């Protein structure tokens, strides 16, 4: 198969400033090719399937496009891989039938309509049935993952890791609920960012969804309900704590966007008992941590909070050794993407690990 060549053709962003979109063609690097079964598993017998492994990087191979107009991620449409050297012309069906996502195998896609008419799509992971109570972990997505397709919410920021063995071991087998709002959590009702003391249009209905999910799954331990998320989802995490301070056993807001000036002293007193683990990077130019996380942490500690932790990173960089800049140094991500450290279980406060800490919390 030495004569193989793969050309990727997809719609993408042509101009980062204007947001202009168009078709982009790229030759992909082939790192392996072999005879396989229909799921891509290597076989040593005759088969009508061939698996081709392609190199990826933070800037190469994503099947998603971030639309500047809607501020939402979506599946690239079209997304085609032209394979030269073989008599095939595969086309990934963006509606779902033609793509395999093993990361989603453990997840169930569902939906919920609240009494106010707001409809949520959501992904859920359910632990094996037994006679034990299980914690519930709730993940709230960022700006780009709103919409009606929860697979985007699960895949765009590696949320599927919450169903994998390392995280589940720390949680002692947890339910995971990943709600997707139709727009953005910070929606003020007019499609604009909420920037004052008014509630998000999703505050009440999101809690309704969570509470209904807990009541429908009677083996969820109501003393171990954990909530967190990134950016817009970090904002909504804080919103949930401020409105329902005795419901959640712990929280893990990441690069959260809730401006501290809108949190009253009385509200600080109401949430100071909640175990909270904050995460952010100093190079975040999307959310100003000096207006959000940093002053809120100071006020919580001053009010006597005894279980507040913070992971602060100088920047967001690749720690796997797989991705490098042109100078050979580790690839530097947008400083807003501090959720990468959370997803990779790299958040610490001294010797204390965030995942292990979360699994130990309870009302």
Residue spans of the language-model regions?
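Active-site machinery of serine-nucleophile hydrolases
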Residues: 136, 143-204
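Short, solvent-exposed loop/turn and secondary-structure capping segments
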Residues: 63-65, 147-153, 187-192, 239-240, ...
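Primarily recognizes the serine-hydrolase "nucleophile elbow" in alpha/beta-hydrolase
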Residues: 214-217, 222-270
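The conserved beta1-alpha1 loop
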Residues: 140-142, 255, 280-281
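C-terminal catalytic histidine-bearing segment of alpha/beta-hydrolase fold enzymes
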Residues: 277-279, 283-297, 301-363
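Short, proline-enriched alpha-helix->beta-strand connector loops that line the catalytic pocket
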Residues: 172-174, 270-276
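A domain-start/cap signature at the N-terminus of enzymes
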Residues: 1-134, 296
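Gly/Ser-rich "nucleophile elbow"/oxyanion-hole loop immediately N-terminal to the catalytic nucleophile
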Residues: 128, 132, 190-231
């Amino acid at each position: 198969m030495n004569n193989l060549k793969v050309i990727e053709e997809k719609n993408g962003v042509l101009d980062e400033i204007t947001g202009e979109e168009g078709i982009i063609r790229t030759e992909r690097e082939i790192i392996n090719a072999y005879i396989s079964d229909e799921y891509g598993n290597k076989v040593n017998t005759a088969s009508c399937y061939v698996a081709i492994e392609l190199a990826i990087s933070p800037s190469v191979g994503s099947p998603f496009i971030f639309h500047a107009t809607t501020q939402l991620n979506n599946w690239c449409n079209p997304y085609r891989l032209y394979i030269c050297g073989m008599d095939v012309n595969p086309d990934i069906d963006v509606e779902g039938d033609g793509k395999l996502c093993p990361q989603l195998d453990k997840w169930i896609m569902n939906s919920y309509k609240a009494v106010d008419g707001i409809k949520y799509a959501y992904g859920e992971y359910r632990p094996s049935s037994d006679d034990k109570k299980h914690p519930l972990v709730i993940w709230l997505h960022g700006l780009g993952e709103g919409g009606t397709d929860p697979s985007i919410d699960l895949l765009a920021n590696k949320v599927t890791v919450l169903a994998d063995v390392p995280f589940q071991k720390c949680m002692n087998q947890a339910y995971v609920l990943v709600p997707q709002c139709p727009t953005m959590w910070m929606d003020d009702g007019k499609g604009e960012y909420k920037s004052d003391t008014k509630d998000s249009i999703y505050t009440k209905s999101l809690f309704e969804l969570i509470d209904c999910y807990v009541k429908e799954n009677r083996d969820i331990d109501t003393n171990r309900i954990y909530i967190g998320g990134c950016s817009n989802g970090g904002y909504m995490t804080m919103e949930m704590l401020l409105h329902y301070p005795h419901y959640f056993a712990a929280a893990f807001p990441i690069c959260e966007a809730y401006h501290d000036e809108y949190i009253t002293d009385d509200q600080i007193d109401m949430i100071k008992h909640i175990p909270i683990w904050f995460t952010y990077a100093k190079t975040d130019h999307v959310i100003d941590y000096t207006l959000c996380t940093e002053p809120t942490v100071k006020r919580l500690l001053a009010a006597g909070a005894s279980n507040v932790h913070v992971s602060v990173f100088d920047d967001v960089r690749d720690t796997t050794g797989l991705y490098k800049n042109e100078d050979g140094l580790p690839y530097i991500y947008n400083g807003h993407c501090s959720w990468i450290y959370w997803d990779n279980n790299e958040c610490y406060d001294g010797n204390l690990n965030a995942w292990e800490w979360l699994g130990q919390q309870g009302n």
